[in-house]
């Protein structure tokens, strides 16, 4: 059974723009699958449809054999609990401490009123500290999140997903705003948790070299359609040119500004 299954998935926006066209994909447990394509190709739409941040127009998406497309209420909450999300701009509460931001990964496990009051059980705090240690920022746990660098804030986001105990992590351009050194650190963290914990990673990346270095599988989107799906080791420059519809530029290969 695939961990994520897209079956005939399409998305049409109210203005008539087609975001996704008849997507059929199976993402297996433990994969590090990278979605690539030009801006507007449908990468974020595809990624965000998995946890229903974007609802699809037709088709169906399954998580471990259960339809998240048809899920509602408690069933949807429980399915989302298993799907961590990492955003390009971190999506942290800036004035809150690092620890409090990581603990927000536990909100799906407790009544809302307890979370509003910050009444997290001791076990949750232990999970949060363990997650921070795994991404090497445990020493920052009591600092305000906005006092940290961009790379450190993205590591808080990763720790939050780990604290959530997600079996799937969706990462939407997580290194787009980071410098090359910090990019490597964040990508190394994602690869480490993928390899050591078996967490499935589905990630959007802009840079070709990063996709080939870290991905086990490349999924190429062009105008909302899958135009390539195969091992990262077989994704040549010619393949990327097909995905992009033109020759790849040097700054798209190397990830430099």
UniProtKB/Swiss-Prot annotation:
**InterPro entries named among the record's database cross-references:** AAA+_ATPase, ABC_transporter-like_ATP-bd, ABC_transporter-like_CS, ABC_transpr_PhnC, MetN_ABC_transporter-like, P-loop_NTPase
Q: Where in the cell is it found?
A: Cell membrane
Residue ranges annotated for the ABC transporter domain, each copy included: 4-248
Residues that, per the record, bind ATP: 37-44
Q: Give any Pfam family that matches.
A: ABC_tran
What catalytic activity does the UniProt entry give for this protein? phosphonate(out) + ATP + H2O = phosphonate(in) + ADP + phosphate + H(+)
Answer yes or no on keyword Transport: yes
SUPFAM superfamilies cross-referenced by the UniProt entry = P-loop containing nucleoside triphosphate hydrolases
* Cited PROSITE patterns: ABC_TRANSPORTER_1, ABC_TRANSPORTER_2, PHNC
Chief location of this protein? membrane
Subunit field text: The complex is composed of two ATP-binding proteins (PhnC), two transmembrane proteins (PhnE) and a solute-binding protein (PhnD).
Q: Relate the protein's function as given in its record.
A: Part of the ABC transporter complex PhnCDE involved in phosphonates import. Responsible for energy coupling to the transport system.
Protein name, entry field: Phosphonates import ATP-binding protein PhnC
Organism lineage string: Bacteria, Bacillati, Bacillota, Bacilli, Bacillales
